[in-house]
Each structure stands twice: as structure tokens, then as C-alpha cells.
Amino acid sequence: MSVTVTYSATFGNYSGTYGPDGINGWNGTDGLFTDDSTTTVFSEENGFLPAFNRLFQIADHSENPGAFAGDEDPDPIVHLGFWGSLGTFSGTQYASSGEYAGLDLGFIVEAADGSYLNYTFFASPSHTIYGEIGSITFGLGLQQDSNGLYYFDEELVTIDDLDTIGLNGGVDGNGDVIDRATGLNDTHNIVNGLKDGDASALWAALD
């Protein structure tokens, strides 16, 4: 199987420069990623995902540094015990946004049907994200509806069917959560990468 990428009608409207440092946006014709033969630095390449790196890394994330939404996992692989009383660490969505020079860019990760996204917090393996990813949407103006689910004022691009390309969901063959420290947890690499303004793990999974 392969992913389905859907671009909005306004996807190509952000090719200008932003902020006092003149950070480059993206050209719609470059899609998610277009190789620039003059560089091997991901954020210097062409396309939306490298531009996401450039903009999201320096954005102000105070409005939404990252949060779960939707139904919580009733039976997580890693039970948080006491730590679970300190917040919400699972859901069917994980979203974050950041504002830079008037561009309020964000992403929403949706769990695959019947799955949940989870964060282990201080339980072992600590600070690890797992769960099967179904889709990721990037957009502008992150909002929550009356049920607490995230959506965008303006969607830019959605990547669907991520659960069909062999990602491990952050779980090994024994059904155990793969520690983030191994570098082998696809879900953690993608979601935590996006949270930190690094879409290279997502592109590596797609490429």
C-alpha cells in the first residue's frame, strides 16, 4: 500500500519570506519535498516539510506546545500508575502549533482506526510515544471543537494511509513498546520529531 497526499487549494499560497530573518516559505509545485542537489541539510531542501522545519523550530509554541485529544486508550500497553493522574497522556489525536511572523502553523496526528496514541511519561520506557498513526494533517489556525477534537481554520496538506506502509507503531514483535532511545520507534520518531520542528523522520518514512 501507499499513502495518499491531499493538497488544499491554498497550499501554494505561502512561497514568500517570513519574519525579520526572511525565512523562506514553500512553493506549491515542490509538494512535500523536492531535493536540492546543492545541500544535504533537510531544512535547506525544497518543499513543505523542509519549510515546516525552518518555521516551526523558531515559532512561539506557547498556545499549544503539544496535547492529546479524543478518547483515551482504555488498555494501554504501558500503564502509567500514579503518573497517569497528572494529565492526559493518550488519545486519538496529538496536535501542536506555533506562530511565527503571523503564520500560525501546526500539525494534527490522527491514530489509525481502532488505535490510540500514547505517551509513557515517567513509566518505563520513559518519555516514549507509541501507537499506530493513520494520518497527519498540517494547517494554519489550530482550533478545538465542542468535543475537544482538533481541526484547522485552514488545512494545507493531509497525508493519509500511514498505517498501510509498514510503520511499527512503536511496538516490537513481542508487543512491547520500543524505547525512544533505540531510535527504532517509528511513531516516536515521527511525532516527537514534528513536535520539535523536525519532519525528516516523517519524510524518511514516506520516501
Where are these regions (language model features)?
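RTX-like calcium-binding, glycine/aspartate-rich low-complexity repeat tracts
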Residues: M1-D207
